[in-house]
Structures are given as structure tokens and as C-alpha cells.
Amino acid sequence: ASDVYKRQAQILLFIYLGLTFCSTLALKLAGMNWFDALTQAMSAVATSGFSTKNASIGYFDSVAVESILIVTMLLASIHFGVLFATLTGRRNNIFHSEVTRWYLSIVAVVTVVVAGSLYFGGVYGTVAGALRYAAFQVVSLISTAGFATADTTVWPATAIVLLISVSIVCGCAGSTTGGIKTDRF
């Protein structure tokens, strides 16, 4: 039994450190200094929301940085065993996990609805702008990372209610996210 636990710990460490390394490198390539890249990456993988800047990720005002962190937060909120299965070519991977498909579907649908609310509510003048900020905030809250890129206090009630709703549902069991978990719905 101890060999099984040792193997599971190794897998968790491999996924956690691998995500942190890849995210750090990508953030550095996107223009951050090494300190900011490492701390934002560590926070995104841990889905803890700590930022070195008072304005959180909004400080960087970078689509590249936001995109990297969206991917990192999404991956960190998926069961690490499923991520490992995906990396090793096993059948029970991201594309075959029913929970992961549900989770990613929730993210996609809520992002589109929030973006529509922002665009038609006149908060952002372009669909691209509405999608940019909606995607980041939805992923940040459903993953329980808590990063911010926008002042959501000026967002329409529909967007706020959806953001609160996804922050309750959260990510998948076996990930770094907090909350109830998608698996239980």
C-alpha cells in the first residue's frame, strides 16, 4: 500500500511542478520579470489568487498574460489524475472524462452568457473585449483562484449572479480548487 501512496504523491508533485514550470516560463516569455512570473504561476496553480500587484492581474493589462493564466487555472482545476492520464496517453484522459467535459462546458456557457451581458449591457464596446474579461473572471472564480482583471462592481446583475454561482460550483475533485466541486452536481 505504501508504494501506491508513494506513486500517487510522485504524480501529484510531477503535475504540480510541471504546471508551475510551464506557466512561469510562458509568463516570462509574455513579458513578466522572473519574480512576477513565478509568483503568479504558483498562485494560479494553487488557485489561491495571490498577486504581487495591488491591481492583481489587471496590473499587467496583457491578453497574453491573461490567456496563459486562464489555461493554467483551468488545468489546475481539473483532477490531477486525469491530467496525468492525458500526459501519458491513457484512455481516461481529459477528452474522455465526463466530469471534465461538464466542467469545461459550464465554463464555456457561462463565459458566453457573461460576455453577452457585458457587451449588450454596454460595459465593453466590443465582443472581443467582453469575451476577454468574461473568460478571465469566470475561470478565475470557478477555479477559486480569485485573480481580477476588471472592476466587476460595474458589471450587470446577470454577470454578477453568474460569477457568484460559478464560485460556488468550482473545479473538479482531485484538483487544487476549493468549493463544492463539479463532480457533486
Please provide the spans of the model-predicted regions.
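Membrane-proximal intracellular helices of multi-pass ion channels
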Residues: 2-185
